[in-house]
């Protein structure tokens, strides 16, 4: 294992008023561990393999939200990324919920080809997913909406997601309006502009950090007969 430069002293100087230099940024690296990925140890179905990794990430006390994922869409031939939360994984794919009038929803309507990234840095792991997003049924959206905390339900009504907002006060006023309309303890209806997307995967890649940047990358690709597993150069 090679020795990696220690940049924390430089960072402490930068935090106390010094400039964060290019050299300091370039020195920000660490060695990865010895745990590797072998094709023979991977499950035949990548969804099963993902579920196993997700459970392990959820048990890791350093990872705050194991179900957090970076969702990337396309707008005018340019990628747009943001973090959202995975709310269901099944044999069909990965499900998340959002405002159907949001920027991400408008982008999906034009181009449903999306990617997901699960960055489990403390475990030196990543999972990258490519697939096609489609809306889930209204009943599925409703079933999840009623399980949400009351404050989140009201927030879904109050926020015109991705629209311009003149001030924070305007948002708070909208929240108060809907909180009065649907008091805590009452049944809050599912907004017509709110629901879920199912991402049907076509490619799922599992990445494990290794020594000397010789990382393991195992990629499942969907074919007519099922999933094909292959290895990529790091």
Residue spans for each PLM region:
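Binding-site signature for planar aromatic cofactors or substrates
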Residues: 2-234
């Amino acid at each position: 294992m090679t020795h990696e430069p220690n940049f924390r002293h430089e960072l402490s100087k930068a935090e106390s008023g010094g400039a964060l230099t290019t050299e300091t940024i370039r020195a920000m690296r660490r060695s990865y561990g010895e745990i590797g990925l072998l094709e023979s140890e991977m499950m035949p179905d990548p969804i099963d393999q993902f579920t196993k990794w997700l459970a392990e990430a959820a048990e890791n006390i350093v990872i705050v939200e194991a179900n957090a994922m970076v969702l990337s869409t396309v707008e005018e031939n340019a990628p747009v990324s943001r973090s959202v939360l995975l709310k269901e994984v099944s044999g069909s794919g990965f499900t998340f919920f959002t405002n159907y009038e949001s920027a991400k929803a408008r982008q999906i309507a034009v181009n449903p080809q999306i990617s997901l990234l699960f960055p489990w840095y403390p475990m030196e792991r990543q999972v990258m997913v490519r697939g096609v997003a489609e809306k889930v049924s209204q009943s599925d959206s409703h079933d999840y909406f009623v399980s949400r905390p009351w404050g989140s339900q009201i927030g879904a009504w109050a926020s015109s997601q991705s629209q311009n907002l003149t001030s924070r006060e305007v948002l708070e006023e909208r929240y108060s309006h809907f909180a009065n309309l649907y008091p805590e303890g009452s049944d809050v209806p599912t907004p017509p502009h709110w629901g879920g997307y199912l991402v049907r995967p076509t490619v799922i890649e599992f990445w494990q950090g290794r020594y000397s940047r010789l990382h393991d990358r195992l990629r499942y690709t969907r074919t007519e007969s099922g999933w094909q597993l292959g290895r990529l150069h790091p």
